[in-house]
Amino acid sequence: MAIDLQKLTLRRLLDTQSNDLYSKLLNQYFTGINQTLFGKVRSFYKAHLRLPSTEEILCLRKDVGLQEYIENQIITEENYNDTIADEFLVAQLQDFYIR
């Protein structure tokens, strides 16, 4: 089973609402709809608002396509792994971006 580090990182960010993790991430580390989702997360931080919990995001129902993506692709057991350190995730995303 392959781990999608972008999805795993987004799940970790939504679950933990970690400012420390967010501060280490760049928009360029993500591609496709993952980049769109990270942009939504970034908009909360830019407005100095608290990042909503995963449950709150799912209740908003503003962007149905993005909501379905979060439910079906991000909030899955495959994208949950609390043994991988945040620093490792960031380093791997950074390495992928550089290449």
Language-model features: where?
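Noncatalytic partner-interaction/assembly domains of nucleic-acid and motor enzyme complexes
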Residues: 1-96
